[in-house]
UniProtKB/Swiss-Prot annotation:
The gene is ppk25. The active site is at D175 (proton acceptor). This is Serine/threonine-protein kinase ppk25. It catalyses: L-seryl-[protein] + ATP = O-phospho-L-seryl-[protein] + ADP + H(+); L-threonyl-[protein] + ATP = O-phospho-L-threonyl-[protein] + ADP + H(+). Belongs to the protein kinase superfamily. Ser/Thr protein kinase family. InterPro entries: Kinase-like_dom_sf, Prot_kinase_dom, Protein_kinase_ATP_BS, Ser/Thr_kinase_AS. It is an enzyme of class 2 (transferase). It comes from Schizosaccharomyces pombe (strain 972 / ATCC 24843) (Fission yeast). Keywords: ATP-binding, Cytoplasm, Kinase, Nucleotide-binding, Phosphoprotein, Serine/threonine-protein kinase, Transferase.
Length: 423
C-alpha cells in the first residue's frame, strides 16, 4: 500500500511563531538586499534570459510559491529559484521566509540543501538554492513501492547526521517528512530542505508552537503539550524510516480524529519482510512517551544502523558551538565580525548596533543564546578554510569506521588541526 500522497502533501495545522527567547531579535522587514539574483525580479517565464541566468522550467510548487530551474549561461551552473509572492499582513509567512533564507545561508552540511542567495522586493521574495536534481524522496518511494533496507539505512544515517548537526546548534527542524528530503542525481545522497518552521530550542524554555505535517507529527504535538524540540524530529524521522521500508505511513485513517487517536496510541504493525533490527529501531523512535523515546545518538547505536559501514561515510561537520572553552573564547569575542553581523542584518534581524550589543552581553554573561548560535554559524560559513564539502566522499572501509561514527565526530580543535588552520 502506498502512502496517501494527497494527505501527506496537504495536511498542516496551526501557525508559526517566534519563541520567547528569540523575541529580543527584532525582525527588520524593510531590509533590502542588493545581490546578483536581483536580475530575476519581475521575471518568471521559461526561456527568459536575465543577466547571466536563464529560467528553464517549473520544478516544484508549494504553499508559498513556485520553484524554477535556472541555469547560469556563463558557467552552466544549475540552481533552484524559489519565488514567494508577498502577502500583506501575513507576519508568520514573513518570519518563515526570512528564517528559511538565513538558516540556508548559514548551515553547512552535505545533507542540507544550501541557500546561495536571497533578495526581497515589495512584491516577492526570491531564494536561490543549490539544485538537487533527483527529486523528492516521496516520488522516489512511490516509483518503487518501498526501499530495500540497505538503501533505507544509508538515507536514515545521512538524515541522522543532518539532524544531529542541527541539534548541536540548538536548531530543531519541526517539519521533517519525505517531501522535504531531496535526492541527488545518482540517488545516493539525500538533502534536507524547508527550514521555514525551524526554530531554536532550549531545555529551559520549551517550545509551544504546533506545526508540521500530521502524518509525521509526534503525539505530544497533537496533545498541545510544550516540548523541547529534538524529540519531535526523532519521531518524524522514525516515520520517514517506516515509510521508506514499508511503502506506507505507520498511522493512517480517512478520519482525522481517528488518525489522531492512532498516532497517540503508537500501535505499530510491520510487514513480515521487515527485519527485527529495523522494527526495533523504529519502535524506539516512535515511542509515544517523549521521555522514553530514543535520542538520535542512541538510535545510531542500534544494530540496524551499525550493520555495515556503507552509511557511516562522514564525520559530522564542525558545530557552531565549540566544545573546547579555549577555542570558543578565541572564536566568540569582541570585536565581532562585521561581515557576519551584516549577513544577519540583511536577513531580517536587528540593526548592527543592536546585534553587537546583544552579542557583547552574551559574551560578558558567558551565555549561549540563539543569536550566539547564529553568529558562530556565520563565522563558520564565511571561513573558506573551514567550509564543509557538499558532496559525499568515497565510501569508508570498516577500519576507517571510527572516523565517521556519529558519536566520534571531531570537535573544533581537531577539525582546525586536521585542516592545518591553527586558531
Amino acid at each position: 500500500m502506498k502512502p496517501n500522497t494527497t494527505n501527506l502533501r496537504n495536511e498542516c495545522w496551526d501557525t508559526f511563531s517566534i519563541p520567547k527567547r528569540s523575541q529580543n531579535i527584532k525582525i527588520n522587514q524593510s531590509t533590502k538586499h542588493q545581490r546578483s539574483i536581483s536580475d530575476f525580479v519581475g521575471t518568471a517565464g521559461p526561456g527568459r534570459q536575465v543577466g547571466n541566468w536563464i529560467i528553464k522550467k517549473t520544478i516544484g510548487a508549494g504553499s508559498m510559491g513556485k520553484v524554477k530551474l535556472v541555469v547560469n549561461i556563463l558557467t552552466g551552473e544549475k540552481a533552484a529559484l524559489k519565488m514567494i509572492p508577498f502577502t500583506p499582513n501575513n507576519t508568520s509567512q514573513t518570519v518563515r521566509v526570512q528564517r528559511e533564507a538565513l538558516l540556508g545561508r548559514l548551515l553547512r552540511h552535505p545533507n542540507i540543501c544550501r541557500v546561495i542567495d536571497c533578495i526581497r522586493t515589495p512584491a516577492c521574495t526570491y531564494i536561490l538554492f543549490e539544485y538537487v536534481p533527483g527529486g523528492q524522496l516521496l516520488e522516489y518511494i512511490l516509483a518503487r513501492g518501498k526501499l530495500d533496507e540497505d538503501l533505507a539505512r544509508s538515507f536514515a544515517m545521512q538524515l541522522i547526521n543532518a539532524l544531529v548537526y542541527l541539534h548541536k546548534n540548538f536548531i530543531v527542524h519541526r517539519d521533517l517528512k519525505i517531501e522535504n528530503v531531496l535526492l541527488t542525481q545518482d540517488s545516493r545522497q539525500v538533502k534536507l530542505i524547508d527550514f521555514g518552521l525551524s526554530n531554536f530550542y532550549s531545555k529551559d524554555d520549551l517550545l509551544r508552537t504546533y506545526c508540521g505535517s500530521l502524518y509525521f507529527a509526534a503525539p505530544e504535538l497533537l496533545d498541545a503539550k510544550p516540548y523541547i524540540g529534538p524529540e519531535v524530529d526523532v519521531w518524524s524521522l522514525g516515520v520517514v524510516i517506516y515509510v521508506m521500508v514499508c511503502g506506507r505511513v505507520p498511522f493512517d485513517d480517512v478520519s482525522v480524529p481517528m488518525l489522531h487517536s492512532k498516532i497517540k496510541s503508537g500501535k505499530l504493525e510491520f510487514p513480515s519482510y521487515i527485519s527485527e533490527d529495523c522494527c526495533s529501531l523504529i519502535a524506539a523512535m516512535l515511542n509515544v512517551n517523549p521521555r522514553k523515546r530514543c535520542s538520535l545518538e542512541q538510535a545510531a547505536k542500534f544494530p540496524w544502523l551499525k550493520k555495515n559501514s556503507f552509511c557511516l561515510y562522514l564525520p559530522i561537520p564542525l558545530t557552531s558551538i565549540p566544545s573546547t572553552p579555549s577555542i570558543r573564547s578565541h572564536v566568540f569575542k569582541p570585536p565581532f565580525n562585521l561581515k557576519v553581523l551584516q549577513l544577519l542584518h540583511e536577513h531580517g534581524l536587528a540593526s548592527i548596533p543592536e546585534l553587537k550589543h546583544e552579542l557583547y552581553m552574551a559574551y560578558i554573561e558567558r551565555k549561549t543564546t540563539s543569536l550566539v548560535c547564529l553568529y558562530l554559524l556565520g563565522v563558520e560559513s564565511l571561513a573558506p578554510a573551514l567550509r564543509i564539502p557538499t558532496a559525499l566522499p568515497p565510501v569508508y572501509s570498516r577500519h576507517q569506521r571510527h572516523h565517521s561514527e556519529i558519536l566520534g565526530a571531531m570537535d573544533l580543535t581537531e577539525k582546525i588541526t586536521a585542516m592545518q588552520c591553527p586558531p
